[in-house]
Amino acid sequence: MSFFENTRKPVGLGGKIMVAMMNFGHSAMAEWGLSFLQPAPDAMVLDCGCGGGANIKTLLKLCPNGKVQGIDYSAVSVEKTRKVNAGAIAAGRCTVQQASVAELPFEAEQFDVVTAFETVYFWPELAQNFREVYRVLKPGGIFFICNEANGETAKDDKWTQIIDGMAIYTDTALKEYLEKAGFCQIQSHKNKKGWLCVTAQKR
């Protein structure tokens, strides 16, 4: 397995290095994307594909009276996220578990917000996975997607060739999947760096 395969599912030493790099390398994009999200101070949030845990730490600050849960199907990512957010976990404001978006381990209508930073590229069945997100969101809840690649630049093709199982979606493609899953009020934002943020609301 090449080092870059760890972007999909971090494992071993290479995976530990990758999740540490994720926390630093994606911070500017995450900050930009979160400018389009205004969660309530007491929001219940789920971060799907929590990677190195930095975004959960930020979400906990944005929701000082809320709780944030995280899932990742990489044991390395779960371990790192728990370390980064150990204080919040001890305080009962955060839980992190190994799980897949294909079958979220939550009851229906639990969350006000579900976030997905740099992860939908690797989701196995986007249509079904979006329906799972829809299921666990409360009515009126927000699904937030933030990607460094918007599917419209030459460099995007390079990454899909290097990383097996990676698919980069345009905002138009994501909107189609979201609408089929039942979402409404879909909005997309792009910048000159090619970053993409999409928000969608559960009916």
Predicted segments, located by residue:
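C-terminal alpha-helical "lid/dimerization" subdomain adjacent to the S-adenosyl-L-methionine
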Residues: 4, 10-23, 27, 142-199
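Conserved H-loop
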Residues: 40, 90-91, 184
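A short SAM/SAH-binding and catalytic strip from SAM-dependent methyltransferases
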Residues: 113-125
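Class I SAM-dependent methyltransferase SAM/SAH-binding core
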Residues: 44-103
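Conserved alpha-helix/loop element of class I SAM-dependent methyltransferases that forms part
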Residues: 24-43, 58
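A short glycine-rich, Lys/Arg-flanked "PGG" loop and its adjoining helix->strand segment in the class I
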Residues: 127-139
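A short acidic, Gly/Pro-enriched loop at the edge of an enzyme's catalytic core
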Residues: 102-113
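Short glycine-dipeptide loop
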Residues: 42, 65, 137-142
